Amino acid sequence: MTKLTARQQQVFDLIRRAIERTGFPPTRAEIAAELGFSSANSAEEHLRALARKGVIELAAGASRGIRLLAGPEDSPHQFTLPHASIMQLSLPLIGRVAAGSPILAQEHISQHYACDPALFSSKPDYLLKVRGLSMRDAGIFDGDLLAVQKKSEAKDGQIVIARLGDDVTVKRLKRRPNGLELIAENPDYENIFVETGSAEFALEGIAVGLIRPGEF
């Protein structure tokens, strides 16, 4: 069993609750504000201590790049699925999406996963396999399984799944006076501006959770 200090346990529990509630880990600034640290640097020190103890993994340069590994009590609350007897959702896993066809077309479904609904902030309709690192700083990495709820509308600031012509992308939505912007959470990627009424744009859904691969 990994031994944590009281403060480290608070940080670990905060990360766990944030992921359970929103599907994503908190930023250093959010940890500092929640726990009353003087600065985000203080949160960073505790995160590094947790990483040294092997209970989390940090992604360099990513504000939300925190992955929970084994907890101090080997807690199964993050990224691991509960025993089959309490699994309630059967979610299709979507791999690559062919140009011009619906996301949930049968040919896109590679398999189904049984998942505990408590893993998600709202009930998802499917899992989408993430390609690339454009959302790295939101804690979304290549190969992750993004839980998606089908929606044709989204709130400002939500992480959305959008269709742009023949492509499907995951970005953070930001409304602008004459359209909207799809924001990448990685400075190596460009944001995408979409004019109001663009026929090339369609909102497919919103992100309601995240599962790491290999944890089923």
From Swiss-Prot:
> Which positions make up the DNA-binding region?
28-48
- Keyword DNA-binding listed? The answer is yes
Entry-linked CDD domains? S24_LexA-like
The alphabetized UniProt keywords are: Autocatalytic cleavage, DNA damage, DNA repair, DNA replication, DNA-binding, Hydrolase, Repressor, SOS response, Transcription, Transcription regulation
Molecular-function GO term, any one: DNA binding
Recorded hits in InterPro entries, A to Z, give:
LexA, LexA-like, LexA/Signal_pep-like_sf, LexA_DNA-bd_dom, LexA_repressor, Peptidase_S24_LexA, Peptidase_S24_S26A/B/C, WH-like_DNA-bd_sf
Record EC number: 3.4.21.88
Any idea which residues are catalytic in this one?
S134 (for autocatalytic cleavage activity), K171 (for autocatalytic cleavage activity)
The catalytic activity, as recorded, is:
Hydrolysis of Ala-|-Gly bond in repressor LexA
> Site (Cleavage): which residue positions?
A99, G100
PANTHER family reported in the protein's UniProt record: LEXA REPRESSOR, LEXA REPRESSOR-RELATED
| Function description | Represses a number of genes involved in the response to DNA damage (SOS response), including recA and lexA. In the presence of single-stranded DNA, RecA interacts with LexA causing an autocatalytic cleavage which disrupts the DNA-binding part of LexA, leading to derepression of the SOS regulon and eventually DNA repair.
How does the record describe its quaternary structure? Homodimer.
> Record's family?
Belongs to the peptidase S24 family.
Protein name stated in the entry: LexA repressor
